[in-house]
Every structure is written in structure tokens, then in C-alpha cells.
Amino acid sequence: MAGILSKTLSEVHPSLRTNGMGIGNTHRRISLGFLPPNKKNPLVRKFRARTRNIDQRSFRSLTDDFGSNVHEPNPYLGNIDEEPDLYYHDEEDGELSRTISLPSRVSETPELSPQDVDWILHEHERRYSSVCNSDNEEASQSNTPDRIQEYSGRELEYDEFMNRLQAQKQKLTRSAVTDAKGTSHHRRPSFVSVTSRGSVPTIYQEIDENDSEALAELAHSHVTFKSEARVLASYSFPLIFTFLLEQIFPMVCSLTVGHLGKNELAAVSLASMTSNITLAIFEGIATSLDTLCPQAYGSGRFYSVGVHLQRCIAFSLVIYIPFAVMWWYSEPLLSYIIPEKELINLTSRFLRVLILGAPAYIFFENLKRFLQAQGIFDAGIYVLTICAPLNVLVSYTLVWNKYIGVGFIGAAIAVVLNFWLMFFLLLFYALYIDGRKCWGGFSRKAFTHWNDLGHLAFSGIIMLEAEELSYELLTLFSAYYGVSYLAAQSAVSTMAALLYMIPFAIGISTSTRIANFIGAKRTDFAHISSQVGLSFSFIAGFINCCILVFGRNLIANIYSKDPEVIKLIAQVLPLVGIVQNFDSLNAVAGSCLRGQGMQSLGSIVNLMAYYLFGIPLALILSWFFDMKLYGLWIGIGSAMLLIGLVEAYYVLFPDWDKIMTYAEILKETEDDEVDSDEYLTDSDDPDENTALLGA
């Protein structure tokens, strides 16, 4: 009998001996004899708890136990071709099945939950972690000339399989909420068996239409330079208009107050500079979502996108508290810098009102990135198209209306109202139009892993503040040469900041795509997206340069009526146009680094280039060589060129292994944050209430 059995097994096809559930499995070799009970196996433990009879184990097929939809058509991986079962018939008509499974009563277990799917994720991660044969089998099969490599592209199929299982887990979470309300639902979808050929199994025949579209998008098939250029263009244009509309708000504030007097205008300018520097900190914190949210979305962990949003908002609000205190007591702080008491008083009053609007700005910036991670880039246009004209109307009414106008402080109130209106309109869009898919409800996880978030946020703050402060320093240095030079520098800086929004929008779009691809483990497509983004940066820089060079006289006359100021602006703008090419490369390359999760590298490059090279060079050229505004812009432009070249090198020649490892660390950190009652125990207590497929 033993000889016949041995001879029969030796004639079995190699694919049946290497990837099946039983025979020849290199990870778990199950004896064909009677299986002893494994008390640590959660399936056996659950079965014992339900039946109280350890002798009811079965050798029925896993296909029969777990699947009723085995032979239904598969819309994702195609039909699974099942090979006929191989049986050995002895004299008593016994049979030897090629698959061995657990009791058929397992299929009668309660409805699946997200914890159930967690167990399946861990089990498949272990079971499919390798597709290689054992050493002995590999050596014995290496001599077969017609051996076919059956595992090409297996890793990509496995990644897609895991993404789909993650998506189904989130669907079950939504179903659990519906079930809690007493709503009936259909019988749970079943699993398809693992075939002898080792192909990735089809899971959950019933999938949400929205999830299906998302999973199809995650496949990222047929990505080429041309197709990616179309995608980035469709993402970038809405963002360009969004950022340009955002730049209108401070201009409206200055124009509205400017006619009240020079002290009021100076106070608004000083308060705007202070608030811009402060709010740039929270925008830098929000840039961490450029890494976290798109990567989570690309890997199919949709609800993690919402958790990252909550965590970043909570983190930002805590950081905002000391800055709010500083704004409230800004009057004594400003007295050490500015001697005019009236100017200090007006600035302090303006900042105290802005305290109420800063939280809304934080909400808006984070929610905007939450939507961008899902590929929703046009929401900002709709919101700002409504807010921009309303802001003009409200500002004029609160400042100049003889019935309800409150004068200077009305401009600050208008800014606060505008911030809150922007946030509520964007929230309405996310709730009722598009973007709610990644929201799984409020979670206590928002108050965990702040240390990991802080590393990304700190680097993002340095990247933004380094450039923001460098522009402010140029304005301060220009005041040394007189009022005309200060006015010219202010106009040129404002125009440069406005045009900077074009490459910045391209960079945000590119970083989102890169992070999506990294989350989907498609580094080849992420590299294509990086190349397209950098190519677009040269186009944007050239367009900005042409605008400043050929429109220099028109721009100068818009900003001033003073002949000397007009002349200075017209002379400096061509140089600033050349610098825009470097700044455009800098903007896109820095955004690509954020998409890769390499903010720390970008922060180091920005700090060293600006403050160890650019600013000192600007001071030397402007003061010692008497080049004045030319020297300032040559110095800062040289720093931008250096930053752009260094960052572009690391974008085009990245260490993908390091990037993917870091992305996996972020993913595992998020996945490890579960409640203690969701973990399996090794207890043999028959009365335990361990879930069948616990996480």
C-alpha cells in the first residue's frame, strides 16, 4: 500500500506538488494521514468552541467549505481553470484528495467583519510570501528542459490581490454600520479556492461599484509618458486657477484698507507678513499629507486617508495654541521692533481678530489635500469661485458701508469670514458631491503616531519657510536703499509669488501621482510621473519668464505711478524672469521629493542653499559690489538653481528600495494601531470568544 501511494505521488504534476494547499507545500506540509488537532490554530479552536467535539474534523475540500461562487466569472483576474482532482482508488474504493481542508461547518460561521479580513490578510501574507520551491524540489526540477516559469508577474498579481482584500475590509466596515441599524443584508460573499496552479485567488465576488472603479484605477495599466502628461495636465489646470484665486484675497484686503490711510495700509502689510509666516508653518505640516494620503489611497487603504487627515488636523491645532497666544500679545512683542505705537496697535488688533480664522485655514488646507489624494483637484475652483467675489463684497461692506461698516478692523473680520466660508463649502463638497469614500468616521488613531507625523511635518515646514523667509529678507534688505527700491522690490516679489503658483500646482499634482504609484508599489510608473513633472516645470518656467520679460512695462505701470519705481521694476523684471526658470524647477522637484516621502532631504538642501549660499551671496553682490536689487536677485536665483539641480537629481535617480521601505514602515505603523481586543490569543479555553478570522 505504501509503495503504491509513493509511486502515485511521484507521478503527480509538479505544479500540484508545489503550490497546493497540501502536497509539497513549502510553507505548510500537511500530512495525508489523520490530522492531529492544533489547539493554537484559530480555525480549529473556533470549531471546537462551537461543536465541543474534536472528532468531527473532515478532509473535505477547501473549495466546498469556503466558496459557493467558485465557478462564477471573475471580472478582475479572469476565470480560474480548475484541474480535475486526482484520486487514488484502492480496493475499498477509498480516495485521496489533492487538497485538505477544515470542517465543512466552518462555512456556517457568523458574518465576516473587518477583523476577519485582517486575519486573512496576515494568513495570505505568510502563505504567499514566496513562490519558490524547496531546495530539494528546485534541484530535482532544474534538470527538466521544458520547465515553464509559472510565476512571471506574480508579485504584481499578489499586490493587486492584497489591495482588493483591503478594499473589501472597508466595505465590510460600512456593512457593519448598516447592520447595527437593523438593516438586513445579503449573505456574505464567499472565497474562491486556491488552485493547484498557484494563481492568485479571486476574492469576494461581490464588490462595490465604487470600490471596483478605485481598484481598476489602482492597477495603473499602460502608463506611458504621453498618457501621464495628459493626466498631470488635467490635474494641474484646476490647481493653477485655485492657487491664483487664493492670491487674490490678500490683495483685496490691502486695496480695501489702503484708502483709509498710510498707517492702516502699513498695519495690514505688517499683519499680513506676520500671519503669512505663521500660516506657512501649518501649510508645511499639511504637506505631510502629500506623502501619507496618496500612498494610503494608492495601496487601497482608503479609510487610512481619513485617519491621516484627522491626525494632521489635531496635530496642527495643538501646535497653533502657542502661536495664537503670540498673536494675542503681539503688541508688546512688536514694540521691540517697531517704534510707532499707532502702527503697533493697529497691527495687534488685526492679528487678534485673525486668531478666529486660522483654525478654518488649517481645516481648509488639510481637507484640500484629503481630496487631492483621491484625484479630486477641481473642488477648490468651485469653492474659490464662490468665495472670491463674496470676499470683495464683504470686505468693502465691512470697511466702507456707512451702516454696518466698522472701518479698519472690518478687513480682518472679512478675512475670518472668508476662511470659514471656504472650509464649509469644501466640506459640503466632500460630504455631498465627491470625496466621502475615504472617510470612515472619527477615530482615536488621530491622537497616535504624532512622532512619525512630526518628522514629515518638520521637514515640510523647513522647505516652505526657508523660501518664504528668503523673500521677506530680500524685501527688508531692499529698504536699506530707500523707499523707491523697497516699493519696487515689493511689487516684483508679489508678481514672482503670483507666478510661482503655476509650477507649484504642477508640483502638487506630480507629488500626488508619485505617492499613489508608490502606494500601489509601481515605482516604474512613479518614475515616469517624475519625468513628466520635471518636463512640465521647464514649460512653466519658460511661460513665466516670457510674461515678466515681455510684459515688464505693463506690470510696472499696474503696480505704481511713480516714474522712478516704474523704471526700477521694468529693469529688474527680466532678471526675475530668468530666475523663474530656476524657481519652477525648484518647486516641482521639491514636490516630487514630498511625494516620495523624502522631505528631510529637501529641507536640508533648502536650508543650506538659501542661508549658507544664496543669502550671503545676495548681500555681497548688493552691498559690496553695489548691484542693489540686481545683486539680491542674482544671489537668491543662484540658490534656487542649486536647489533645483540637486533635488532634480534625487528625483530622477532615487533609491527606490529605501523609498519603498519607508512607505512600508508608514503602512505598518498605521496597521499596527488596533485595539487590544482584536488580537488573537493562544488560550485553549473552550469558552473563549475569539473571532474565527480575527486580526
Swiss-Prot record:
The identity of this protein, by name, is Uncharacterized transporter YDR338C
Specify the species.
Saccharomyces cerevisiae (strain ATCC 204508 / S288c)
Subcellular location per UniProt equals: Membrane
Q: Which residues are annotated as modified residue Phosphoserine in the UniProt record?
A: S113
Bias (Acidic residues) occurs at 673-688
Protein family (similarity comment): Belongs to the multi antimicrobial extrusion (MATE) (TC 2.A.66.1) family.
List the lineage, top down.
Eukaryota, Fungi, Dikarya, Ascomycota, Saccharomycotina
Another remark in the UniProt entry says:
Present with 195 molecules/cell in log phase SD medium.
Q: GO cellular-component terms in the record?
A: membrane
Q: Does the keyword Metal-binding apply?
A: no
Q: Which UniProt keywords apply?
A: Membrane, Phosphoprotein, Transmembrane, Transmembrane helix, Transport
A Pfam match: MatE
Topology in membrane? Multi-pass membrane protein
MF-aspect GO terms = antiporter activity; transmembrane transporter activity; xenobiotic transmembrane transporter activity
Q: Which GO terms describe its biological process?
A: xenobiotic detoxification by transmembrane export across the plasma membrane
Known PANTHER family for this protein?
Answer: MULTIDRUG RESISTANCE PROTEIN (PTHR11206)
Question: Annotated region Disordered: where?
Answer: 673-695
Q: Known CDD domains for this protein?
A: MATE_eukaryotic (cd13132)
Keyword S-adenosyl-L-methionine assigned:
no
Segments passing through the bilayer: 237-257, 265-285, 313-333, 344-364, 380-400, 408-428, 457-477, 488-508, 531-551, 565-585, 604-624, 633-653
